[in-house]
Amino acid sequence: MIKKICSVLSMVVFLGLLVIAGFLFVPKMLGYDEYAVLSGSMEPGIPVGAIVYDKNFAASEAREGAVVTYQLPAGTLVTHRIISVDKEEQTVVTQGDANNIADTAPVAWQQIVGVYAFHIPY
């Protein structure tokens, strides 16, 4: 009986570790980068603590409504929605879904590190 319980517990632990490994490694192998959401600026769609998975950014994806992750000059990463695109200047204006106003400075396409694909809530 004890052998049976140990066998079942071992299988449960193994499967749990397999699921965790899947969340950690499979997206990376498929070309996704992951970022933690530290503020409520994209709530309720993307909650605080969620892990956002992004694909590489291409200029053709600079369109209104797309959610992108970009790097501020100080190095901080921000995930916000594009609300306008200036193709001539190659910049976008972004805004968090929960914010009342747009972000203060336009974001150059070179600052964009990825386009939102999906997230896993905390």
Where are these regions (language model features)?
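Short beta-strand-centered aromatic/proline hotspots
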Residues: V37, A66-V67, V78-V85
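Protein maturation boundaries and topogenic segments
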Residues: M1-A50, N56, P121-Y122
